[in-house]
Amino acid sequence: MHAIMVPIGKLIKDILDERGLTATWLADKIPCGRANIYKIFNKNSIDTELLLRICIVLEHDFFKYYSQEMKE
């Protein structure tokens, strides 16, 4: 069994960029500090509760990237 590698932070940043949203906007919505959002952008893993909050705020299923990785 191998570790599932999903560049989740980059994926979150990409969605924000596509929508013209900022780290400050996301930090206000989650809520958490803006500095923490920038740390998230550089991570390859994330707490599931935090990821769920991000999914809800952005209305985007980031969990699907892990499911796709498991199928490959």
Annotate the PLM regions.
Residues 18, 29, 57:
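Residues within the alpha-helical elements of helix-turn-helix
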Residues 25-27:
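Short alpha-helical "recognition helix" segments of helix-turn-helix
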Residues 49-65:
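DNA major-groove recognition helix of helix-turn-helix/homeodomain DNA-binding modules
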Residues 15, 29, 40, 68:
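Residues in the recognition helix of alpha-helical DNA-binding motifs
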Residues 31-46:
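Recognition helix of helix-turn-helix/homeodomain-like DNA-binding domains
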Residues 1-22:
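A short, Lys/Arg-rich alpha-helix, primarily the initiator
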Residues 66-72:
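Short amphipathic recognition helices of helix-turn-helix/homeodomain-type DNA-binding modules
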